[in-house]
Amino acid sequence: GGMRQRVVISLALAAQPKLIIADEPTTALDVSIQAQIIQLLKKLGREHGTAVMLVTHDMGVIAETADRVAVMYAGRIAEIGPVAEVIHHPQHPYTIGLMGAIPSVGDYNERLAQIEGSMPRLTAIPAGCAFNPRCTRVNDVPGQRCTTERPGLLPAGKTRAACWLHATDNAAAHTKVPA
């Protein structure tokens, strides 16, 4: 198990890249092989001075390997920041719902939380915040901003969130993603 991933990683490093983008590198692998592949990516990244960007839905992998995380919704960054902050103190309503949907270890009687509604088609993203049709906080923002204006990434605690709940004034609407 994991031999294909190892071969692809080796081929990628042969070109001496500054960045490796690993899209779901551990999907369909058992936990022990998954850990080996992640450790290999980290080790080779350090040895070769190569940055590794993981694209994954597995928050466990993110928690174990990444320094920073960008949570995306409908093709846009909803929240970005240090992994521990985003996981333990999420600021965007989508990130809050996402973290709440992760089952607790050992609590078999707990009902899994879910985010009501469904993702929009990427060809039909709603005006304003793409999450607004599903957001439980949409009415907490004055002036219908969530449904009319797309928010930029706004300071939100130790992260940045694309959410009008964190706007201090109207001028904060269009900030850029930090490097």
Whereabouts are the PLM-identified features?
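ABC ATPase nucleotide-binding domain "signature motif"
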Residues: G1-Q5
